[in-house]
């Protein structure tokens, strides 16, 4: 596939075995200069371990140090650190599942940290309150 204006493709996250299969299948059809990036923060580890070069993260914007530490642990092959960081982030991933995605959760977390007003989302969206 010739994609001269495309530098990266964002793919939805999948569990580890399917992520590896999906990345391998896509790689067969893409120029080597096109990167693959995983979306869905809870799937970052599976996607990066499967060969994605990027993680399109919502939590990385609010929690950059933790997100960077996770990427570095994955990239270095530090299984114990990767597992520990995923365990620390598990409550956030569960909130994303519980509230139907990351937007309201991250907006509420940002408000709790004093980074925005508690009522900062545009209507009809509501904070978790």
Task: Spell out what each predicted region is.
Residues 1, 126-128:
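Active-site beta->alpha loop and helix N-cap motifs at the rims of alpha/beta catalytic domains
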Residues 2-90, 96-98:
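Catalytic alpha/beta core domains of metabolic enzymes, predominantly
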Residues 48-52, 90-126:
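Conserved short secondary-structure transition element at the edge of the structured enzyme core
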